[in-house]
Amino acid sequence: MSMANFTGGRNSCTFHEEFKQVLLPLVYSVVFLLGLPLNAVVIGQIWLARKALTRTTIYMLNLAMADLLYVCSLPLLIYNYTQKDYWPFGDFTCKFVRFQFYTNLHGSILFLTCISVQRYMGICHPLASWHKKKGKKLTWLVCAAVWFIVIAQCLPTFVFASTGTQRNRTVCYDLSPPDRSTSYFPYGITLTITGFLLPFAAILACYCSMARILCQKDELIGLAVHKKKDKAVRMIIIVVIVFSISFFPFHLTKTIYLIVRSSASLPCPTLQAFAIAYKCTRPFASMNSVLDPILFYFTQRKFRESTRYLLDKMSSKWRQDHCISYGS
């Protein structure tokens, strides 16, 4: 039986969390098995076409790198949850794995924001030249700034996340130990605002402006904008799916959970209900590591064409070998 002790304020509760032994290893295994090859292929594909990098593919490259680094840490979490929260890998590894999760989460959000702004400029301001003059150099500087901001945002994870002891077993706390829930609360809320709400507001503003242009009759928009219309629509749909599955449910349940676990008056069943809701959405926040490569595939025509060419070549090779084997 999997249980977690919670002690904060005047509350001392024992949570029953058997669901984590099934849900979290299952979702993390799917993310690992799909995310590792998909992001490796994206990075390899961009590397092969590095002489023809665009601003969007530079953002996609950084997005794939963040996803790949994160999925490499998932085997530790899969082992942890299959062993009923037992963490044998030490305190620093616990802190680093939690740091990996949040840097990937908020890095993905910011890089998707950059891609959305880039697409917004192409659709709503196709004749503007200020963002084109700097070209790739400006894009690389933006990526460096994103990494700096994300690392600075998530560094306090090394202070709050830590190992502890429950029922004579070492565990790795996700947010903070229960007795530090009150001190973690301001940081957790600030991270949600700066790492999710503000970028999400920027994306919504870009998409509303883009929708106004894309919904116009074709004869009212320029040829250059018309060519980008389908690509922009695909990107909007996929980014909305990523936010709907990965980001919004997680941040909503996390914020509510931070509020209730900092309270000194709520009964244990209420605390457990919100804890379960939060911990059920947490593994799905990792799904962006699978969805991001799909975004790359559906918004990059050259990548789709090269992928089809590779698959056709592999299929032809298989049919040829199969016919030879059958004939002999």
From Swiss-Prot:
One of its GO terms (molecular function) is G protein-coupled UTP receptor activity. The chain crosses the membrane at residues 23-43, 58-78, 97-117, 140-160, 190-210, 232-252, 276-298. Disulfide bonds join 94-172. It is a multi-pass membrane protein. Its main location: membrane. This is P2Y purinoceptor 3. PROSITE patterns: G_PROTEIN_RECEP_F1_2. It is found in: Cell membrane. Keywords: Cell membrane, Disulfide bond, G-protein coupled receptor, Glycoprotein, Membrane, Receptor, Transducer, Transmembrane, Transmembrane helix.
